Amino acid sequence: MSTADALDDENTFKILVATDIHLGFMEKDAVRGNDTFVTLDEILRLAQENEVDFILLGGDLFHENKPSRKTLHTCLELLRKYCMGDRPVQFEILSDQSVNFGFSKFPWVNYQDGNLNISIPVFSIHGNHDDPTGADALCALDILSCAGFVNHFGRSMSVEKIDISPVLLQKGSTKIALYGLGSIPDERLYRMFVNKKVTMLRPKEDENSWFNLFVIHQNRSKHGSTNFIPEQFLDDFIDLVIWGHEHECKIAPTKNEQQLFYISQPGSSVVTSLSPGEAVKKHVGLLRIKGRKMNMHKIPLHTVRQFFMEDIVLANHPDIFNPDNPKVTQAIQSFCLEKIEEMLENAERERLGNSHQPEKPLVRLRVDYSGGFEPFSVLRFSQKFVDRVANPKDIIHFFRHREQKEKTGEEINFGKLITKPSEGTTLRVEDLVKQYFQTAEKNVQLSLLTERGMGEAVQEFVDKEEKDAIEELVKYQLEKTQRFLKERHIDALEDKIDEEVRRFRETRQKNTNEEDDEVREAMTRARALRSQSEESASAFSADDLMSIDLAEQMANDSDDSISAATNKGRGRGRGRRGGRGQNSASRGGSQRGRADTGLETSTRSRNSKTAVSASRNMSIIDAFKSTRQQPSRNVTTKNYSEVIEVDESDVEEDIFPTTSKTDQRWSSTSSSKIMSQSQVSKGVDFESSEDDDDDPFMNTSSLRRNRR
């Protein structure tokens, strides 16, 4: 687009483009806690000052999948401050909005809502940090969409086939087909592209008159054989691709010579990892589109915290460092000190005249100490810069360059290997699980479960806090294996069962689509179980509170009545306290309601725990046994019902210990009863609470009761 065409008129779209804001990153840090909020304020202010038609976000608006109340509140506050007003919106929507926003309860663009006064619409896809999760598949963007501040588009409702329907925009004579695809696991999306399961729909009328703009949030650089999306997978009719997820700022559009479209990679607006890609200056883009022509003007962000990074190799300075010198460590420290001082001077020099930039910069010095050198204490060294840098704990990163064996194929990027990932973009949980089982010994290999399924379950457990994900996957694959063995009518011999299980597992591993269905079904079960647990927990807590309140009220009434009778009979000798025997009895009597309530609650808890334990101990061989051979659970319930009848002296011994002889006799009686109660408990599948917190396979409801 020429300079004359770039002039704003009624036919020119002005779009502010940004990605990977990661709102709420390190919000609890005393120094860096407000960095993301300040930068979002600057981005929205730039949109208002440049009078853009709308804001386009490429995913990862939030850093956490479940952002905190502070993060959500600040985001809503800033969106209301800058995006609401009386300035009219100059473009219109031509496409069917019920298709573009069909997953929303309000399937229309927010500025056309009669109850809202929007001056700058915000269009956004979701990223891998704020993607939909849970039984209802909701994400943080859905909250903003329901509130009317963000238009969430590009969401795929199917995991088997994706049809991307564009949002059709028109301003004057300029028409834009806005395509969006929210974050999907790269391996799955890669396979869908290979199998021709991704379709980008085009307008039926005069399709060549539209400017095709595509927003995607996936790995662009190659992290594995299928753990990225090649640019060649995208359709060649696209004019411009806004690529999110990659944090290095490459906002200037570059042309793909094979597909003949342009790619703009805005990068993140906040430093989330101390890696070389984050050291590039941060920008947002002001995109102008007129007809089929475009112009991208990059705008530097002035509120981003400075980040300086430098690498040194000790072996490259033989004149300064000798590993045989006993004082070589002091020499290395002095050399590192000089390098850091130089970076701090550069930071102070660049910060002159910019009052909006944070005072303390981020500094990272990577030291290659291969060649016989030894690292020094980083914590002690960092104490010198506590008041001068924002990351005093990890200023220096020591690494050793190890020689790799010669391999055929592409070279290994050692820069990525030595960079410590901090947000899971280069090192993922499921890859670690897969790598572990591939290199593990034969006796610890999985024989029933699959590596892929376990990797997905562990990822859900770690990243999305789905505490039942691992347990439900194990249950689902176990049930499926049991059904397979029953259908084959295998003899109940351990050797034959093991052989059939291995054969069945290999068959499932080859069928990747079936394995994906298994993982999805298990995750759906886990999310549904979490929702049911939360509802039952809230109802259970309400019942407990009511029973405790009633018990306390009955206890207080009992105390008052007994105390009144005591005062009347004994006169002034004991006052309100009453006699020892009566007082002791009244206390025991007043606690009767509490004792009954607590024991009933404990009984319910133990019975539920027994049921869970019984289901967990279910093995494959048990599937061939008749249900009549299984022990009845009524016996256990009967034992507990006998334990419920406890004299009030048991509770008195635990709550109000005394030293009188009578109380000592009660104490011995109570001790014997408590021992008998514990013996009955040991007769059931009793689980110690010491290891429950570390057990990811434990039921969520059991964990909640143990924490009480």
UniProtKB/Swiss-Prot annotation:
Q: Identify residues that carry N6-lactoyllysine.
A: 673
Assigned EC number: 3.1.-.-
Question: Gene3D superfamilies recorded for this chain?
Answer: 3.60.21.10, Mre11, capping domain (3.30.110.110)
User: Where do we see the Glycyl lysine isopeptide (Lys-Gly) (interchain with G-Cter in SUMO) cross-link in this protein?
Assistant: 384, 467
User: Looking at the record's lineage, which domain of life comes first?
Assistant: Eukaryota
Which cellular component terms (GO) are annotated to the entry? BRCA1-C complex; chromosomal region; chromosome, telomeric region; cytoplasm; cytosol; Mre11 complex; nucleoplasm; nucleus
**What about PTM?**
Phosphorylated by ATM at Ser-676 and Ser-678 in response to DNA damage, promoting MRE11 activity: phosphorylation activates MRE11 by preventing the interaction between MRE11 and the C1QBP inhibitor. Phosphorylation at Ser-649 by PLK1 primes for phosphorylation at Ser-688 by CK2, inhibiting recruitment of the MRN complex to DNA damage sites.
List modified residues, type Phosphoserine.
2, 275, 619, 641, 649, 676, 678, 688-689, 701
What broad class of enzyme is this? hydrolase
State what changing residue 88 to W does: Does not affect interaction with NBN
Q: Which InterPro entries match?
A: Calcineurin-like_PHP_ApaH (IPR004843), Metallo-depent_PP-like (IPR029052), Mre11 (IPR003701), Mre11_capping_dom (IPR038487), Mre11_DNA-bd (IPR007281), Mre11_N (IPR041796)
What is this protein identified as?
A: Double-strand break repair protein MRE11
Species name: Homo sapiens (Human)
